[in-house]
Amino acid sequence: MKKIIAAAILLGLLLFLIPMGLRQSRQTELPEDAREELVLPSSGYTLSVLVNGTVQELDLNDYLWGVVAAEMPASFAQEALNAQAVAARTYALNKAGRAAGHPEAELCTDYACCQAWIARETARGNWGENALAYTNKITAAVAETNNEVILYEGQLIDAVFHSSSGAATQDAVEVWGNSVPYLQSVDSPEGEEVPNYYSEAVFPAQAFRDTFLAARPEAVLEGEPPQWIGDTVYTEGGSVHTIVIGGVTVTGAQAREIFGLRSACFTVTPTAEAVTFSVTGYGHGVGMSQYGANAMAQQGKTYEEILRHYYTGVTVENYEPTDRQ
């Protein structure tokens, strides 16, 4: 009887310890990217980049890593980050050497001229406890799309992008006055979940008058604000195409710049005391919406599908940087 009891106790211990061992084993079998930093492969192609006043020679992939990290939140879905990497690569190769503001370098890190860029060490410091995970997501975005670009009829496109749109992106001709076949207005799925999707800018009457007259001194702003605002024409994408202020017609893009609005997708409410702009989205609205890309990725779309949605009639193909004209 004692032997039977001892055997039963031993069997019970084994049944208890074996699952524990299995659980411990599973806990240590973490994905490699959760424990180690991925290695970013070299593109084999070098660009001269103006960084804080100094020209640096950067491998294309190292440059793109800093662009994706600076231009798109690393918390976004992987397919959205991949789409950003392809758009950034295309934009860089198309733009390199053509920016008049810095003849000593092919590109710069000023987002208003080329693309935003951040050093890896700075980005990791900003990400805190998420540094390893986010570093690997950006590395994967660049590596998984290595050499891939966006082409229209065999040529690199001007792969412009922006933060968020209203219900749709804008046709390039409505914003910049030149028609571009692949920069058409398309639906964009982001919405109120986007930070600061809706914003408001309120100008007291005198401040509105001073601001607009500084930009358009020929305007006539007499009486009260309701008399200043004339007809507003909207684009297919829902942004302001033109608006009449003080008898002067300006484009939505010009009004956005004059009044410092987040986008040209706005409505205007004038009262006797003030003029209020109610704004939707952020950015010029042309090309790929970054928050729209993230929404599409969360819906299960691939980065190729995202890019083909936002850039009409394009293809995503492998491309050697030395092939650019």
Which residue ranges define each predicted feature?
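Conserved, single-site charged/polar hotspot
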Residues: 1-325
